[in-house]
Amino acid sequence: EADKSIYDKINSKLTLIDNVKVYDRNKNVYIESNNLIYDQVENTIYSHGKTLIKIDDIYEINSKDMLYDRNSMRLSSKQDTIIEDNKLNIYNFEQGFLFDTIKEIISSKKTNITDSSNNNYSFENTKINLKTNEIVGKELRIDFIDSFFGNEKNDPKLSGKSAYTDDDKTKVFKTVFSTCNMINKSCRGWELQSEEFTHDKTKKLFEYKNSWLKVFNKKL
């Protein structure tokens, strides 16, 4: 569906212009854009400008200049992209992304995630397995909601050089963690540094290996 269509017989390409709406029934993929090009030879769809894609009523993707390969069922873009799922998680991908919709794996250079509890996670060189809820990445930073550890006056943050997380546990390496209030934003009261940090989500336990505590501007 579109206001205007142009078919190039020589190159076997169909261009759809303005108010474009495409529903791929075989793949259960819905696309909205103002300019789409369907390449029959390559079996690909390329969008120019803002694009909305919905997959299986599970994922909603907002991006620009997207490539949809119908053979491999891969979506990609070099532009900033936001993906929302039906579990209220929001994935913000900077500098583009690649989404293998069959394996449900997303790769991105820079990733920001806001989970359903409103905690914020930042990664670099990330791979996300949406089937298993596994995330692997580098340069992790987590901004927890202030009340995450039971005190709304806290400002809990955690950072690490690399990380792995799934439904059962989160493991972060070379970690810096603090729950101290940062009213003046100039310096934390304390921070805990660890070679390895593990959060057992089932047992609700935190484990630290090779750790040391730093206290700032305090007399002990």
Show which residues each predicted segment covers:
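Structural signature for solvent-exposed beta-strand/loop edge elements and short helix-capping sites
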Residues: 1-220
